[in-house]
Amino acid sequence: LRTLRLSETNITDEGISCLNGLGSLTVLDLSYTKVTDAGLKCLVRLKQLKQLDLASTAITDAGLTHIKKLTALQFLGLYATAETNAGLQKISRLKNLQFLGLYGTSVTDVGVNNLKKHLPGCTINR
């Protein structure tokens, strides 16, 4: 299994805990679900994950502590989450990141500009 789209389902942190055995997963869509920061801890084993969509979830800056370990990520959707400038610092080492969606967050131009210094090849949609 390489692609798993669980968008707009009732999946919770408990439900995604079983995903850590899916090591070949490259695309995971958890947008519009009940997933929180605590649930993201189990995703760190998904070393091949390239696309992760967390739009409209309860994810905060704290959740990016786990996301920063997904070094293969190329796409990260954080639309309409509680991310701030402080959280962006946590993902500044995701050197493979090509696209970051931040629309509807509290991130400012200052945060975006600081992140672009670390990830110049990343398109940031805000």
Where are these regions (language model features)?
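Concave beta-strand-loop units of leucine-rich repeat
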Residues: 1-126
